[in-house]
Amino acid sequence: IQIQPNYAMAHNNLGITFLELGEKRKAKSSFEKAIKIQPNYAHAYWNLHSLANDIDEALTILKKLYEFDNKYIKAKLMISALKAFKGKFEDFDTLIRSSESNHPMTRSIKWVFSLPKIPKIFFNRWDFFDAIVAQTDKTRPFYEFGVWNGISFKHLIKTFKKGFGFDTFTGIPEDWHNEPSGTYSSFGSVPKIKGGEFIVGKFENTLPKFFSQKRPLASLINFDADLYSSTLCALNYSNNVIDEKSILIFDELITNKNWEKDEYKALNEFCDSLSISYDVIAVSFYSKQVAIKLKK
């Protein structure tokens, strides 16, 4: 940006980085700068909608995008979803009979609207986290399976003061569709975060020992292991710290190309094995997060 201050893509990418770090104001400023430089920059509009305060604001941004780029499929799908959240299902009904009916976002939207109770929708991970945290028992610690560089952990520890994090810190232990093993590595660097206790290693090696001792009930558990196998392992071993007050967040449960084969599959197999169910309380199509409460 210093070399080319009017390079719209650079401002958009900077906004994505700020958003990943939780710097929402800076992210919004960067997306708006990209749009000012290049008014028909669809990706910047798409990212900007993630910072909307409500459905109406998100719809306004996405409709602007779709006016100049009606081939931006994600915008079309999100518009239909947001209208459905407002009780207007015409676009959604058309969508599920269209050529986009098997798009991963369409499948995600269909799943959400098949639920007994429609959950609340959020547009970015930080607003999602804050809304869920507000519903938790803050006297309890939180658990996170998949820490990576600790950005989410740092955000959560501000509220709970004590957290347990589990990760290899050398990346995912097996291939995840098109992502090779070792992706999302922090190169062995374990975060140093006050109040954080980090258990290093593969889940199948560390969780049996950790949970062989009585552990405090969870306020919140953030499942960010991506893999079906790792998520199922984490669910099985953390079951004893989950009760009716615990809220479970799955970081990438929906909208990925193969979402039904990953965290979603692990959650449903776990519940089926125990003959229990769950209530979905929040979703974010943009950040892919889903929050649930188990019905034990």
Segment roles from a protein language model:
Residues 7, 41, 71-72:
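Residue-level recognition of tetratricopeptide repeat
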Residues 9-20, 43-50, 77-78:
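Conserved alpha-helical positions within TPR/SEL1-like repeat arrays
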Residues 84-139:
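Class I SAM-dependent methyltransferase Rossmann-like catalytic core
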Residues 138-296:
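S-adenosylmethionine/decaboxylated-SAM
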